[in-house]
Amino acid sequence: MNTENRSPEQFDIPLFLKNLPKLPGVYRFFDEGGNVLYVGKAVNLKRRVSGYFQKNDHSPRIALMVKQVRHIETTITRSEAEALILENNFIKALSPKYNILFRDDKSYPYLMLSGHQYPQMAYYRGTLKNPNQYFGPYPNSNAVRDSIQVLQKVFMLRTCEDSVFEHRDRPCLLYQIKRCTAPCVGHISEEDYCDSVRQAATFLNGKTDELTRTLQHKMQTAAANLQFEEAARYRDQIQALGIIQSNQFIDSKNPNNPNDIDLLALAVSDGLVCVHWVSIRGGRHVGDKSFFPDTKNDPEPNGQDYAEAFVAQHYLGKSKPDIIISNFPVPDALKEALEGEHGKQMQFVTKTIGERKVWLKMAEQNAQMAITQRHLQQSNQQHRIDELAKILGMNSDGINRLECFDISHTQGEATIASCVVYDEQNIQPSQYRRYNITTAKPGDDYAAMREVLTRRYGKIQEAEANGESVKWPDVVLIDGGKGQIGVAVSVWEELGLHIPLVGIAKGPERKAGMEELILPFTGELFRLPPNSPALHLLQTVRDESHRFAITGHRKKRDKARVTSSLGDIPGVGSKRRQALLTRFGGLRGVIAASREDLEKVEGISKALAETIYNHLH
């Protein structure tokens, strides 16, 4: 591959277009500040890139983008399929402003059977590694955990971490409630446990009929040998499998249905685009999810463009099903790229009959329903913003971004400040920030608030002064009373800020719906009715800020207490403390360890093991 770069200062677009090759590749458009605007791929770079500057029939989104282009970069590839993969990598890495982006692009969760001697069944998200077995991907974490609960009931596989498994001396509660066979203490042989693992894998691969026949044979054999307790266990497994099968709308008994199928339904309505994904794994419907790309720069979105972007971003570089059923066509180049990664031929189906037609119709109905719900949600959010604007004496168009701050600690210990963001009519978790408070005295909430506000907005001011692109909030919400708001006003004066401030205090009754609002620049202190849309918006953002602060505080506090618990033991320094935590998987594992187990850790003598054990018990 070959890449061509030119600096914005000397860049001549007409000259650049004249010298472009008629080869496949990827192009990037940049604005005056060097920010990437758009990434695209082409079979013929010269024809594709030149078309942006020679045609006048662009969509509003593309037309707005072209006006801002000041610099272009290209990368030549060997084929259109290779260009498509590279384009997708650039889009994920750069998040260009005018590309179609499906923002929920985290790695999807899997159900994992580990490669341990006694395999662990676990929720997993990340890079797939040998020798573990992975089943999925699943649309969300709940779908994985539901499957784990099902498998626990039927196959009773362990879910504990290896560090816990290796140091147990008695069965845990899961054994008592018949959700685990307690391999940790030898209540099941390795051979029998691995047989259960194979059965679970067979079930997850959709071979339920084969598994049922195997269990029926084992039940009959056990009964013939007068092993009635074992026969009853197999009977219970068969009954549980029957219940699971009856709860699925996918017919896993149909031999024409491959194990892994994805259904994709596209819907477009009133400027919104939705792609509804249904995941069928092992012949079972394991979940579904609706995806909404950002269309704010595209008032007349082309559904096919968005559908193709979803397929590329959702599947390239990730696990793929054997078959994709969709209500839109997938381009040949994209099919080629997907099959090249998959290592075998895939089926792409748009014309359906029979039960597949029913499945796709259900997915389309879900996509339409999701769009309807999104419209209602947006209307509700806009109503809340309109009401807040009236209270603050602002134009509702001037309120897009709210930032809210809260302080959390336990009697001054492990103080954390949180900043949560509400933007584009929704909370934005990826933009949340936590701040470790370092200069304030323990328990001094006012000083902590001063520190976090000064750090955050002082840094934004500095970045803006250096010519960087920054986002200022339209309103800042402070979770606290007059004291905290007074601190915020002081910081505003020091930094020269004029952003509207709103304080939200619990009020004397400390009940939801009875909050007091403080507007420091008008001197107003008042309550809104419990059913006020503006109050509901402020409560939502305030509650999220409180949750984010307290979870961060607890993590910091617990980590400090673990360090303190071991650090107080004579003879245990940082290296030995880390060795103990690594060996036993955390403080609980260290506490559960016997004296003999402690001695096995490098650097821990018999005498020191005795000291550690006595200190923790």
Swiss-Prot record:
One GO CC term, this protein: excinuclease repair complex
Pfam families assigned to the protein according to its UniProt record, in alphabetical order: GIY-YIG (PF01541), HHH_5 (PF14520), UVR (PF02151), UvrC_RNaseH (PF22920), UvrC_RNaseH_dom (PF08459)
Keyword DNA damage: yes
Database matches in InterPro entries: GIY-YIG_endonuc (IPR000305), GIY-YIG_endonuc_sf (IPR035901), GIY-YIG_UvrC_Cho (IPR047296), Hlx-hairpin-Hlx_DNA-bd_motif (IPR003583), RuvA_2-like (IPR010994), UVR_dom (IPR001943), UVR_dom_sf (IPR036876), UvrABC_protein_C (IPR050066)
GO biological process assignments: nucleotide-excision repair; SOS response
Compartments, record wording: Cytoplasm
Family: Belongs to the UvrC family.
Subunit architecture: Interacts with UvrB in an incision complex.
Entry protein name: UvrABC system protein C
Species of origin: Neisseria gonorrhoeae (strain ATCC 700825 / FA 1090)
Gene: uvrC
